[in-house]
Amino acid sequence: MSEVVEKADENVVPLFSRPELYPVPSESVLTVDLRDGTVRILKCTLPALLVQLSSPLDKVDYSMLTDFFLVYRNFMSSQKLLDLIQERFQWAIDLRQSDPSSQEKITSEVILVRMFVLVRHWLSNYFAQDFVVDTSLRRQFLQFINGYSPVDRFLDNIIISLKKLWVQNVQIMWEDLENLIVENNVVSRDDWLKWEIEDVPSGSSSETGEGSTKGKRLSFIALQNINNPVLRNESLLSLLHTREKIPLPQQSEDESKKQSTRIKQRTGSMLLFPENASNGLSINEKLTASGVSPEATPKQEREITDPKNSKDNKHILPQLSRVTNVSYMMKDLEYPSTPSVDIFVPPTPAKNIEFILQTSYMETDLPEQSNGSDSTNTVNGNNTNHKGILGLLSKWKLNHQRKPTVNPVQNPPRVENLIKYVFSISSLDNHANPLPDSLSSMFDILSARTIDEVEYLVSVESDLLAKLEAKKLTTEISKLETNEDESQDYSVIDNLNLYKTVSSIANSVISLSKTLNVRTNKSTTHLLSPSTSALERKNIRNSAPMLYSYNNSRYSITNALMGLPNTNDNSSPKRLVFHDPTRNSPTKKAILANNLNNIGEYNGERDSITSIVTYDSAFSDISSSGNILSQHKGSSNIFMESAPTLKRKLNVNDLRRFNFEKSDSTDDRSCSPQNREATETSATSMESDANDNAIQDEYENENEDIASLITAYEESTSEIDTQCQNNAQIRRPTSGRISITRNYSVASPNSLRSILPKSPLILGNEVFIERDKALAANQDIISELEETTSLLLNDNDRKFTVSRGSVCNDSDSQSISTNLLFSSAQASPQKLVIKEVDVIQEKSEHPDVPTPVLCKQPISKLSETPSIKSIGSRDSEESFDLTSIASKPNRAQSTTLREKYHLEKQATNDIFEEDVENLNPENNKYLFSPDTDSIDFASPEKNLDDLKQQFIDQSTDEQTSLDEEEIATQDNENKDHGIDKKKLEDIMNGIDDTADTSMDPVNLALMKLEGTYDKGEKEIDDKSPSINSELAREVENFQIVQTAALPESARKRQSMFIQRRRNTMIDFSVRDSLIDKDSSCTRLENTDEQIRNLLNQYTLTDSRLKIDNLEQHIPFILMYDSKSVANQLTLIEKEILSEVDWKDLLDLTMSEQLPQFTSWLQLLVQNENLSGIDLAIARFNLTVDWIISEIVMTQDIRLRRNTIQRFIHIAEHCKELQNYNTLMEIILALNSIVVQKFTETWRLVEPGDLLTWETLKAIPSLEKNYSNIRQLIDEVEPLSGCIPFIVVYLSDLSLNIEKRTWIVHDEVLNYNKFQTNVQIVKNFVQKMQWSKFYNIDIDHELLSKCVYITSLSHDEINSISHKSPI
């Protein structure tokens, strides 16, 4: 049986020896068409096609070879091609060796040479595309060349050449590879022939051999050849070897008739049908319309929707939103300088100059950055003509002021640049031109929508930061995307790199939300520790090591419940702990010296010596001459004599640097028994009140018991508090020091019992009673130590007050004392100020305190006050100074604005949630560990350099604290409570009085309380010249960097948008083996969908940006000449179409249906899912909708006429620039039904412009398959630059792709279909490469406006078109 099989195999004729393939293909397997001296293959089999490419009789046709390797992937796999090549190669070798003396040997050698040329072309030009990404193909090829046995010199040279070419490509495409030739000791020809080349380890599969466990990284060249469309298109052109124009394929007469018939039959789904184009129809109407109805828009997505014009394997993008109005989801990403149209320029080819408005904010006249001190003419009334502009600026400014500045990376200059470059406001000077009075207040609503979208993210981030301290987390997110390739070219389509900005902010918001949710959902069942000493240690954040120089210090507990410290203040410095290297402290020794096992009887009538340490700050300045009252939550009942103190450097904001110095003496008058007694009692009472309320919110199960404890304690101390408030009041500055006071008193049983809490939760606990008795017994022992140090304490107290009384605080944060926060949850600002105004007015009755020169700094601006959500408590920036509370008598008591600013609406559990999360890592059952050994570990050790950097404030014009300001304003200025009217009015310029919803309600309340808010102030006339300077001041107040253009260094490719597109072009199946897994791109992929979901939550809520406010709208294009706009649009189209890869065109890789994008921001966040064609289509559609939106939203008929004329002139300039893509966008928009219905407006158009329009609108005619636009494209002058109209090419490709691929399934290939595709693609790529001849300067302001455009949704356009007059 086996013999029969062998005979049968011998009788089988090799594939390439069959008559129809040897020596050349016959007509039965390959049909050609000779046209103009070139050979076009119409149909063929795959073996016949390979035979034709390596024909021994015909000359080498490099054009055919190039076309084949461009399109073969559409009808066969690379593995199958390599199989055919190997089979033909081996067949030629066998043929040569079969009869060395015959003619067949010569033929076989020619075939081998032609096959070598074919393989060399493949390896040289498509190694990165085919072999780098396909491990199995590489192994198959290596098996082919390694399996060759030396025969003769001719064949050896072919194999050696292929091996050398392979090794050369491998060395170029992978990094971290040693010199393979040297490593394998390859020197001679024999070495090359014997060398079995190994594949490069990928790391993603189980490789064998040494060193194969670690995958190699691809080189920059490899990545560029894989995912950079610009480089790939240039490489394609380099293979053509022609200086001629590549023509579009010519169709026969029969084919043209068939295509014309198809065009008429498929009108409803064609890319172009301008006669019936209407972008104004709503989405619902389009869904219900018929396929051939006039609803068909000029948008490319209409053809994409047709399944006939799309590939079966095309992906469908997820809808951006399930809401019909996508425009409510997000808008443009650009931050314009203002939403203003600054100048009206006459139409460029205009026949008449109608009016020109002088710009108030041009690059050449940018005002210098000022602090607004020269603003004399202020506007704070309800000026309706400017409410839109000023209100929007105020709202956005407030967002940035609320944003914490501890992490400057989170507020990059690009955000300010977006507002600077994109916000378009009309000019405020009318001059002699007859314009409507309301024109001066108009702005581009579409541009403002773009800014509002980004500001939405900023406000969300600010709100989260106000609830959670996430400095380290957000810093990591900011650094996540800082690695940019500065060597690449400047990116035009995202010139402000807003994709990175938005991604960074969104990542921060996502991370903060996760952290906040984890902490909020975290439940705790800890019991309060019976050890009040442990609780006290927690409260002071390991203050004991600061007392290392005094071994006799001690502390006593006067209250069983002390509050949790607040660490959730995102804008305030945290208390610094300077750890003792010995991890020991005198306080610890004093406590450990007395064993708690020595329980004595509780002596309720014993004498007590109570000591207290308080941290002085801006909130602790309400005190009495005889009884010092501390209102600062940061006080802790620790007896201190002297300690290293923190010195604040003047004019350096928020801990730019600090040092330590010896403590100074203080006034002994502050150490009187009366002072000590009142201070201890009142401070402890207030501290207990605030903190216990916080614990109530955090632990709901214990609310009733703790509430009873607090109530009992408050009742016992109410008389003392009242007495303190009635004493003679004093005024003393914040000293930035620690102050110690003691109270020697003899407490009666009744008085002591009145102070003790009566909570069954605590007093009913046996362990608590035992330990409290132990503390009572130890009190007597510790009292002796206290007496021995009293003299030293008195001396140090004197030094404190004398030397530190004039130190100025340099912080500007507006915060609240937490005890005020919880004193009355229902208190209103009016109620508080009634009590405090009387206190303030008493200042004039007392001698003024000498004001140090260093303290004379401007008063804080009310508009810079942070929002309610960022109000701090104990650990605010103001509380960083450790200040003495001891002060001289006969000083007037003063109440700061911060204390008025006391209403905090966020829940108290937000304030304490961070401590709750960090509770008790050892999982004991107590809220605070009773272990006394933990005293040194109550606070983690801090890195001072990190803290210093963390709290540095970028602002250069910060004001001093209100304590210092009040000292500086003790003269006649105190008549207005220390408020500078001029400064206040300057800030009020940015407040929109008529739109209270855009204002911070706390700022509004403060202004009313201070008497500086007046709605009845006189209105400013619209034509007043002061209005111009007013708007300029608003721009300055927004703290925008005044740069006329981006620096030269910024012209590098900053766009993360481009980089992410490059990385996502690689096939997902091989990306992990090609890209470094630690790269920022890989880490960000996990959050891309979350970012999109976050942006989708944005809804348009500002009434000033809705279509109801159309009377305020004016297109920004009216502030620029049409030539400039055409130039910038050309730059944008050049880079957009450069993202279209030749392979995407050949495969027609585009989505069957695209969402309706209404802003460039939507495209930025979705770009990774879009092919180059999809990106170009989406941009085309967005631009058409934007043009229609600008015209429809313009209500004034003259302005609408000017807008239409301006677009006509821009289109004419685009035609001159050979920018046919933008030209067609404008023509299709102007020819839409929505725009054409404004008949009265068209009647006002200049006759010359109407003639120009008649010529332009004939360009997209369907006659003879778009013969007009094709003629324009064919007549292009290459050296002048060109932007081809991509829709023509997509139309041709769509029609061609409908042809059958196989005439006989899997046997006879319709190769003409693919040759036609290649010809179309090469024509497009060549014309796109001519765009490099453009020599256009970048105008960053105008470019930003043109890039980050926003359009109305179709429903909005439809709604306006029905309401607008004809």
Curated annotation (Swiss-Prot):
It comes from the Eukaryota. This is Guanine nucleotide exchange factor LTE1. The keyword Cell membrane does not apply. Residues 298-314, 661-670 have a biased composition (Basic and acidic residues). GO terms for biological process: cell division; Ras protein signal transduction. Residues 37-170 form the N-terminal Ras-GEF domain. Coiled coil: none annotated. Belongs to the LTE1 family. Residues 671-690 have a biased composition (Polar residues). Keywords: Cell cycle, Cell division, Cytoplasm, Guanine-nucleotide releasing factor, Mitosis. The gene is LTE1. InterPro entries: Ras-like_GEF (IPR008937), Ras-like_Gua-exchang_fac_N (IPR000651), Ras_G-nucl-exch_fac_CS (IPR019804), Ras_GEF_dom_sf (IPR023578), RASGEF_cat_dom (IPR001895), RASGEF_cat_dom_sf (IPR036964). GDP-GTP exchange factor component of the mitotic exit network (MEN). Fine-tunes the timing of the mitotic exit and couples this event with cytokinesis. May also be involved in proprotein-processing in the secretory pathway. The keyword Methyltransferase does not apply.
